[in-house]
Amino acid sequence: MCAVSSVSEFPQFIDIEESPNSLDCEGCIQCQMGSKLVLFITGNCHWRCDYCPLSETRRDIDFMYANERPCNDFDEVIEEARAMRATGAGITGGDPLMARERSLEGIRRLKREFGDDFHIHMYTSIPFKAQWASEFADAGLDEIRFHFLDLSSQEYKEVIEACSDAGIFTGVEPVSYTHLRAHETLNH
């Protein structure tokens, strides 16, 4: 008879509680804390990036999600924000400017429901019309992040200045090293 002994030992995990960096912007801090609602406003995007992580069920589909919950209207978005006790929202997509009016409505509804302290940031890769900056500021957008796709900031200069002048905290998402190396290779 063979004796089998088994030892149940679980791996030991180090409890790492990394605090957000005090230099991080408010949107980053709240995301790191897990307190921001992810508002996927549309799957539509004018770019066709081959590295886009959107699945077939979201890419080029004009539908809205709050976190992973499909939402038909902003009442459902607000319900999801309440359920998670969100302190803010990050608006993303495809590209939120492909559903500009819906993005503006979402900002207004969330601010009306949760107040001015409910922090809202939005991502875009579109160098939009500078006059739209005041519309987003008036709606209550706190922060905007531009993702340069061609590694050139020139076409974004006017809208970045307009957003900043309108009181929207304005940032640029860093370009990945791989993307940068590919760009250098193609242009040399």
What are the residue ranges of the model-derived segments?
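A short, flexible N-terminal coil/short beta segment enriched in small residues
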Residues: 27-44, 82-83, 88-90, 94-101
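Divalent cation-coordinating acidic motifs and surrounding scaffolds
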Residues: 74
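Canonical Radical SAM [4Fe-4S] cluster-binding loop centered on the CxxxCxxC motif
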Residues: 8-18, 24-70
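Anion (oxyanion) recognition and catalysis
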Residues: 164
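Conserved small/polar residues in nucleotide/adenosyl-binding loops
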Residues: 178-185
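Core AdoMet radical
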Residues: 57-71, 84-99, 111-132, 136-155, ...
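Generic structural signal for well-ordered alpha-helices
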Residues: 78, 104-108, 133, 157-160
